[in-house]
């Protein structure tokens, strides 16, 4: 098992396809509580950065399903999975929640990076999640946080949320300046 924290620059990138940044991936995956042999779904895989990190954490005995509706993002996820030589990833081109029908197993954790149709996705995700499993949602909007918490609470999940504000060092001619990134909310819930 490998701990998450691959530098962002190691991923193949395309400008219009968003990527969950390194520090956020580390925190989100820690909230997912992955382990060697775990089964995991990444909904809205984008560049595949969360998919790759999860694939490395769960190891050869584990399995990761990456769901993505954008054709270009699917191709980018494939390229990053190939770059990191992962054999435990299944990439599903399709839109959640319908694409969840292609996941043939109960899973230990689910990450939701795209927030369209969030309530429907959460309700469908619940059917794929083992008891004691976790759903983790990244969000930039307060409305998304409210909808995620409200839905998870109605489903009987034990929930919490953190706000993450990261500043990265930028080298200048006189030293380092700290440049803030946008705040991110990480909502997580544990299935009873």
Swiss-Prot record:
Gene3D superfamilies membership: Vaccinia Virus protein VP39
Reaction catalysed by this enzyme: Co-precorrin-6B + S-adenosyl-L-methionine = Co-precorrin-7 + S-adenosyl-L-homocysteine + CO2
MF term (GO), any: protein methyltransferase activity
EC number(s) reported in the record: 2.1.1.196
Keyword Cytoplasm included in the entry's annotation: no
Source taxon at top rank: Archaea
Cross-referenced Pfam families: Methyltransf_31
CDD domains membership: AdoMet_MTases
Residues annotated as binding S-adenosyl-L-methionine: 20, 44-48, 68, 96
Signal sequence bounds: none
Keywords, sorted A to Z: Cobalamin biosynthesis, Methyltransferase, S-adenosyl-L-methionine, Transferase
Classification via InterPro entries: CbiT (IPR023475), Cbl_synth_MTase_CbiT (IPR014008), Cobalamin_biosynth_MTase (IPR050714), Methyltranfer_dom (IPR025714), SAM-dependent_MTases_sf (IPR029063)
A GO BP annotation: anaerobic cobalamin biosynthetic process
Pathways involved: Cofactor biosynthesis; adenosylcobalamin biosynthesis; cob(II)yrinate a,c-diamide from sirohydrochlorin (anaerobic route): step 8/10
Statement: the UniProt record of this protein carries the keyword Methyltransferase: yes
EC supergroup of this enzyme: transferase
Family as reported in the entry's similarity comment: Belongs to the methyltransferase superfamily. Archaeal-type CbiT family.
HAMAP family in the cross-refs: CbiT (MF_00786)
PANTHER family, A to Z: COBALT-PRECORRIN-6B C(15)-METHYLTRANSFERASE (DECARBOXYLATING) (PTHR43182), COBALT-PRECORRIN-7 C(5)-METHYLTRANSFERASE (PTHR43182:SF1)
Protein name per UniProt: Probable cobalt-precorrin-6B C(15)-methyltransferase (decarboxylating)
Source organism: Sulfurisphaera tokodaii (strain DSM 16993 / JCM 10545 / NBRC 100140 / 7)
Gene from which this protein is expressed: cbiT
């Amino acid at each position: 098992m490998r701990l998450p924290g691959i530098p962002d620059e190691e991923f193949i990138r395309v400008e219009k396809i968003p990527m969950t940044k390194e520090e956020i991936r580390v925190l989100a995956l820690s909230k997912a509580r992955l382990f060697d042999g775990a089964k995991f779904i990444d909904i809205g895989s984008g560049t595949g950065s969360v998919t790759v990190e999860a694939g490395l954490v769960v190891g050869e005995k584990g399995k990761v399903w990456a769901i993505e509706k954008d054709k270009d993002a699917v191709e980018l996820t494939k390229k990053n999975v190939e770059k990191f030589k992962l054999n435990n990833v299944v990439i599903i081109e399709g839109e959640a929640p319908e694409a969840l029908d292609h996941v043939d197993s109960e899973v230990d954790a689910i990450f939701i990076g795209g927030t369209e149709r969030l309530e429907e996705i959460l309700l469908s995700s619940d059917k794929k999640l083992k008891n004691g499993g976790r759903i983790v949602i990244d969000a930039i909007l307060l409305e998304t946080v409210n909808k995620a918490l409200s839905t998870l609470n109605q489903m009987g999940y034990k929930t919490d949320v953190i706000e993450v504000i990261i500043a990265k060092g930028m080298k200048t001619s006189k030293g380092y300046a700290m440049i803030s990134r946008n705040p991110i909310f990480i909502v997580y819930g544990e299935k009873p």
